[in-house]
Amino acid sequence: MTTIVSVRRNNQVVIAGDGQVSLGNTVMKGNAKKVRRLYHNKVLAGFAGGTADAFTLFERFEAKLEMHQGHLMKAAVEMAKDWRSDKMLRKLEALLAVADDTCSLIITGNGDVVQPENDLIAIGSGGNFAQSAATALLENTELTALEIAEKSLTIAGDICVFTNQFKTIEELNY
């Protein structure tokens, strides 16, 4: 699987992800980019789940963003509705972490849209490790969102065998 973490602090939101693609117990690729910018570079998105499904999900989510003029919450709810009702999408076991200058959301394969506490998202196999690290750093340091995301992803990569140290990091300042 993978680890995706999103942190928001002081007018900055960051989504970071590692690059490991695994097939069972075998590392197939170490430099996959699972985080990208969408909708005129105004929305960040990260993906945890099967890599082959990422392109379809990003494409569909970007279409929803276009349909709703970049309104993240509306696009996320519409994407979740499609995910619940589309037979092909329902088979995907995946999560999307998305963020813009107003909110951070998790979109699940069950059709849920969750706005997490403290605008902190951590998903994937190393998500619990990254979330623990990011929470501690948010509560006990003055580090930037970028620094917290990077450090928490590093910690997750040190602990989780399905997370590596290759990082893709995208940030929005607002």
Swiss-Prot record:
Activity regulation behaviour: Allosterically activated by HslU binding.
Subcellular localization: Cytoplasm
Residue pairs linked by disulfide bridges in the UniProt entry: none
GO biological process, alphabetically ordered: proteolysis involved in protein catabolic process
Source organism superkingdom: Bacteria
Coiled-coil spans in chain: none
Uppermost EC category: hydrolase
Keyword Cytoplasm annotated: yes
Keywords recorded for this protein, A-Z: Allosteric enzyme, Cytoplasm, Hydrolase, Metal-binding, Protease, Sodium, Threonine protease
EC number(s) reported in the record: 3.4.25.2
GO MF annotation terms: metal ion binding; threonine-type endopeptidase activity
Catalytic reaction(s) noted: ATP-dependent cleavage of peptide bonds with broad specificity
Record-level GO cellular component terms: HslUV protease complex; proteasome core complex
Binding positions for Na(+) per the UniProt entry: 157, 160, 163
Gene3D superfamilies in the record: Glutamine Phosphoribosylpyrophosphate, subunit 1, domain 1
Name of a matching Pfam family: Proteasome
Assembly notes: A double ring-shaped homohexamer of HslV is capped on each side by a ring-shaped HslU homohexamer. The assembly of the HslU/HslV complex is dependent on binding of ATP.
Family the UniProt entry places it in: Belongs to the peptidase T1B family. HslV subfamily.
Matching HAMAP family: HslV
Protein name in the entry: ATP-dependent protease subunit HslV
Source species of the chain: Shewanella woodyi (strain ATCC 51908 / MS32)
Gene transcribed to yield this protein: hslV
